[in-house]
Regions:
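Active-site loop-to-helix "anion-binding N-cap" substructures in soluble metabolic enzymes
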Residues: 4-411
Length: 411
């Protein structure tokens, strides 16, 4: 497959604006606020996937090596209650982060106040302080996600330089990205730079044939990106839960499968206009309930029963999709082919991952569940790029501006 060379320099992201990177700053003896993305999946107080932590290390180590005093900000999950605060305490990442950096990372359990300010003032060159989950500020008043001006200004007051390396939140205007960047000399980190270069390259000049794989649940969530990509892609292969809305729009029986009823008319119009581009499953795996104990069977789309739920694409659909993928030179994939978290319903996703890992093609995995599946199934190093941002990558490919980047462009 194609391997992209990433050159870390001032980055032209496809327009006249030039973004400064961390390498454009003198970091020695400076307090460097780095917005990272440590929004990792957690179960039973254990980190299930540390990919986002691992991807942040290059930027953090660079700041350490250049003599910076590093202050890390990140969110973890959503915080709408005191119980959410307990569940999403960011201190859980400290042991793994310390291990990866080879130093003892300090942690402040507060997002503001004298304790935080004192810990910042006591930092020595080359030391790292991780601040508590920025979304603690979302309860009860959504100050973080609402980009509260005072909060952004306060966090900015803690540092000398701001580096945004959290691509996964770049499509959001939050106090911890836009708010800080509006008040401080700012640039981007190595991860953000790589994400922008790779995804803008695909958006602006994809190698042809260009195939998009879309899965996941609701069509409505991806209408914008579908409208953008259907104009430039050669084929769009649709699997996962969203495929059943398209099949319903073609008057197919979908049993009790997931249906985005509000999007049926949209799907009808899209199929009518782009029938040769939109490729849908021809068979599926079905069951009566989604659980580890559920019995399942494979059947054609026409043979699904009223009480059955589609949970994966079938073997014939995999072979159909392979025909379009085999000649592709660019593949962008967002959304798994089925309920991949259950072993019996993961074969469609696994089979497509395996096939893509062995063809001569530029392959981009766009964040979220697809990235987690690729990593968990052992394909972490098999693709050109696995993005750390689901929504951010889709909005960039759609042609939208990313507020977290735009705030730095406009400095």
């Amino acid at each position: 497959m194609w391997i992209l060379a990433i050159i870390y320099d001032k980055i032209d992201i496809g327009k006249s604006d030039i973004l400064k990177t961390i390498k454009d700053f003198d970091l020695n003896n400076k307090k460097i606020i780095i917005r990272v993305d440590f929004n990792v999946p957690i179960k039973d107080s254990k980190i299930l996937d540390d990919n986002r932590i691992v991807n942040s290390i290059e930027t953090i180590k660079y700041a350490i090596d250049k003599g910076g005093k590093v202050i890390l900000l990140s969110h973890l999950g959503r915080v709408k209650s005191e119980e959410d605060k307990v569940k999403n305490d960011l201190s859980i990442v400290v042991p793994r982060l310390s291990e990866l950096l080879g130093i003892n990372v300090k942690f402040c359990e507060y997002t503001r106040g004298s304790k935080l300010e004192n810990m910042v003032s006591e930092l020595n060159n080359g030391e790292v302080l991780l601040v508590q989950n920025t979304r603690y500020e979302d309860f009860p008043n959504k100050l973080e996600s609402g980009n509260d001006l005072d909060l952004g200004n306060y966090w900015a007051s803690l540092g000398d330089i701001f580096i945004n390396d959290a691509f996964g939140t770049a499509h959001r205007a939050h106090a911890s990205n836009v708010g800080i960047a509006s008040n401080l000399d700012s640039g981007i980190g190595f991860l953000m730079e790589k994400e922008l270069k790779v995804l803008n390259g695909v958006k602006d000049n994809p190698k042809k044939p260009y195939t998009v794989i879309l899965g996941g649940a609701k069509v409505n969530d991806k209408i914008g990106v579908i409208n953008a990509l259907v104009e430039i892609a050669d084929y769009i292969l649709i699997g996962g839960g969203m495929s059943y809305t398209f099949l319903k729009a073609m008057d197919k029986n979908i049993g009790s499968s997931l249906l985005d009823s509000e999007s049926i008319d949209y799907c009808k119009n899209l199929i009518s206009k782009y029938r040769d581009k939109i490729i849908l499953p021809i068979d599926n795996v079905v069951c009566n309930e989604i659980s580890d104990e559920a019995s399942s069977r494979s059947c054609s789309i026409e043979d699904i029963k009223e009480d059955e739920i589609g949970v994966d694409i079938g073997a014939k659909s995999v072979e159909l999709f392979k025909k379009y993928l085999s000649n592709s030179k660019t593949v962008v994939w967002n959304g798994t082919m089925g309920c991949h978290e259950y072993d019996d319903f993961a074969n469609g996703t696994k089979d497509i991952l395996e096939f893509l890992s062995n063809i001569d093609c530029e392959t981009i995995i766009c964040g979220g569940d697809t990235a987690s599946a690729a990593i968990n199934f052992g394909y972490k190093d098999k693709f050109t790029h696995i993005s750390t941002g689901g929504g951010a990558s889709l909005e960039l490919l759609e042609g939208k501006k990313l507020p977290g980047v735009e705030a730095i462009e406009n400095k």
